[in-house]
Amino acid sequence: MHSLDEPLDLKLSISKLRAAREKRERIGANARKRSVHHELMIRDDGTTVITPICSSPPPGFRYRDGDSPPFSSPPIVDLSLSPPSGTDSPSRSSLSPDRAAGDTLIDNPLLRCGGDSASSPFQFFLPLGSGLQLPPSMFMSPPKENRLSLEFTEQKQLVCQWAKCNRLFELLQELVDHVNDFHVKPEKDAGYCCHWEGCARRGRGFNARYKMLIHIRTHTNERPHCCPTCHKSFSRLENLKIHNRSHTGEKPYMCPYEGCNKRYSNSSDRFKHTRTHYVDKPYYCKMPGCQKRYTDPSSLRKHIKAHGHFISHQQRQLLKIHQPPKLPATGDSNYTNGTQLIIPNPAAIFGSQSLPIPLTPGPLDLSSLACSSVASALAGLPNPMLTLAGSPLNLAKGSLLSQAYSAAGLGLPLISLVTSGKVENEKRPKGQRGDSSERTDGSKLRPGSIEGLSLLPRGVLDLSPGVGSESLLPGWVVIPPGSVLLKPAVVN
């Protein structure tokens, strides 16, 4: 029977028609072969080029498998290669392996890099508009095990994984009908319990059949509700309604707080916004020393991810067991502007210079310094005068920061120690290593003694355990102005 694209000539025999058709096919095949027949060569530096078979190689090229050099030297199309790494960067190519033959991804075991890396194949893309093509024999199909895994995944989705069922289905609708008719309906007396293998509910039932049907869609991947605008499908009708508001711009949920006119397309977003108007922030960071609190858990997760405040399960147990004792509320210690004593671990900045700090030290109360003069208070205290978790604290001067670390680089605040008595607040240079002294009430204290406490320019208060500063590598602390009640807190 003749094809419709050929003229019907009754005077020609079938054999002549077949011979003419084969001749035209041979001519077309030869023309295409001459236009696309190229040779792959690998440069010494690992770069692969495609050049017509009649070309001569430029310097630095070698031929594979003893091929003879061609005769002429037309222009060369250079296709740079790089061995495939674990993750392909977006800058490698913007082409997709699904493109036409002119843009097809090549992954051929014959394209190998010479030397020790002969086992790693190269991948490259043919440029757009180049007109170059490669024979189909050079293209690799996915490995057999990958094809089997994909087929198994698709087939597994159409298997009823209800307990002791394992029936196979060709269509998704058949699987859905089977589950609804044979498994959901008989579960009415049992409380609509899901017995799908691996279900996270672990046998906990539903009080209504429609809830059970919605839950089953998480196992069967059924999405019966489709958006008429963008054709995106959803498993629940409520989700489709919320999605449609992104097309219509409707925002029916308004903030109930007086004076706030913000509106939202769904109630959950409005609920998150509403909590920002109230003081209650129940979600807090559990990293010791971090006092960040948030109104919703998503903001807390962003904070933990941004600052690396991850607490392991063992650390959480330690923090629960060893809670710091609370100070007794007395009338004498009325602190309205409490400030924490920040004792960070300087190992991240200063290398080996680290201060070991207990996880649960008790509050450090410097209320005994509340008098008209810090010097008189220090003179009346024994040596060592303060303790932290049973260890004596060294309040003597010490060389803490070297000249190499600038105050601007560390970002330390101004140093000032303020008691509840009458003390002058003077701006001090930011914390660096050096000598120490302090000004209070306009009287100069002699540096280098217990009375001359630690707050000269370029001085830092040393609270490392031990009487002598030589016992441990000293850490560094910063006391912001404005308080006398100081609570130790480890800072990441």
UniProtKB/Swiss-Prot annotation:
InterPro entries: GLI-like, Znf-C2H2_ZIC1-5/GLI1-3-like, Znf_C2H2_sf, Znf_C2H2_type. Residues 69-129 are annotated as: Transcription activation. Its main location: nucleus. Residues 82-97 have a biased composition (Low complexity). Residues 423-444 have a biased composition (Basic and acidic residues). Pfam families: zf-C2H2 (PF00096), zf-C2H2_15 (PF23561). Can act either as a transcription repressor or as a transcription activator, depending on the cell context. May be involved in neuron differentiation. The C2H2-type zinc finger 1 has a major repressor function. This is Zinc finger protein GLIS2. The gene is glis2.
